[in-house]
Amino acid sequence: MPVESSKLLDGKGLAQKIQGELTAQIQTLQAEIGRPPGLAVLMVGDNPASAAYVRNKERACERLGIASFGHHFPAEVTFEEVKQTIHDLNANPQVDGILVQLPLPAHLDSTALLYEIDPDKDVDGLHPLNLGRLVRGEAGLRSCTPAGVMRLLAAYDVELSGLHAVVIGRSILVGKPVSLMLLAANATVTMAHSRTPDLAAVTRTADVLVAAVGKPGLITADMVKPGAVVIDVGISRQEIEGKARLVGDVEFTSVQSQSSLITPVPGGVGPITVSMLLENTVWSFRQRHKGSYNS
């Protein structure tokens, strides 16, 4: 039975609210510490999507008063060159956060490079130490997209305790960390992936469904429990009527009528992800000044 009262989870509006709060925090902290927070973004090559993401981050930094340290390398840059830059940024007292824009060219080992980032400046939350802190439930830098998903759910008063959450996708970027965060919120969590038999049978049991695969239109209305909360993390570019458009993993029009809350693409999880990156940078700025990462 369709749910008529489906509402959009407005990531864009929430992101603006968060960034307004961060601006006020930065002004207070800068007066106390004597400098603004600093974020370094490393990009390799000329991938158009990556370039657009980096521009968005740099503009957001400028709006909030975060110093931006951009490093753009040619596609043929060596591993050692990028590694040395990361080490220099680790040692730079003006830099509080370091982000390596993914994906990287095939000749660069992204996992090895992420290991080189100082865990206390790892604002993408992908260093093994920060992932370990997440597993243990300790304070630390959290992966931005999963943290954004949790912030959206909290903003719309979704009480996760006792609910069944199904996460589709098992990547270290989204699927695994968001599953741990949902578990910490006392949801019962099922992870589904490419080897899950009868995916629809699994997704139809979800009170909260998180799709994080990158396969357009994977989730259709017949796969969704009436009244479910649907979070679409996937984002792909498709040619629609001769124009390139961003689409998610969820077939939005049909699923919207089946769900109680749903994120649009674009305008859902994406804007919150950027805000979580900025929030992580400010958190690192504050913690480095306090000399503690345990609170």
From Swiss-Prot:
Originating species: Acaryochloris marina (strain MBIC 11017)
Chain's role: Catalyzes the oxidation of 5,10-methylenetetrahydrofolate to 5,10-methenyltetrahydrofolate and then the hydrolysis of 5,10-methenyltetrahydrofolate to 10-formyltetrahydrofolate.
Keyword terms of this UniProt record: Amino-acid biosynthesis, Histidine biosynthesis, Hydrolase, Methionine biosynthesis, Multifunctional enzyme, NADP, One-carbon metabolism, Oxidoreductase, Purine biosynthesis
Annotated NADP(+) binding sites: G169, R170, S171, S194, I235
Domain of life: Bacteria
Protein name: Bifunctional protein FolD
PROSITE patterns: THF_DHG_CYH_2 (PS00767)
Similarity section: Belongs to the tetrahydrofolate dehydrogenase/cyclohydrolase family.
Documented EC number(s): 1.5.1.5, 3.5.4.9
Catalytic reaction list: (6R)-5,10-methylene-5,6,7,8-tetrahydrofolate + NADP(+) = (6R)-5,10-methenyltetrahydrofolate + NADPH; (6R)-5,10-methenyltetrahydrofolate + H2O = (6R)-10-formyltetrahydrofolate + H(+)
Subunit structure as annotated in this protein's UniProt entry: Homodimer.
Entries under Pfam families matching the protein: THF_DHG_CYH, THF_DHG_CYH_C
Cellular component GO terms held in the UniProt record: cytosol
Pathway: One-carbon metabolism; tetrahydrofolate interconversion
CDD domains in UniProt: NAD_bind_m-THF_DH_Cyclohyd
Cross-referenced HAMAP family: THF_DHG_CYH
Molecular-function GO terms, alphabetical: methenyltetrahydrofolate cyclohydrolase activity; methylenetetrahydrofolate dehydrogenase (NADP+) activity
Biological process annotations from GO: L-histidine biosynthetic process; methionine biosynthetic process; purine nucleotide biosynthetic process; tetrahydrofolate interconversion
Lineage, highest ranks first: Bacteria, Bacillati, Cyanobacteriota, Cyanophyceae, Acaryochloridales
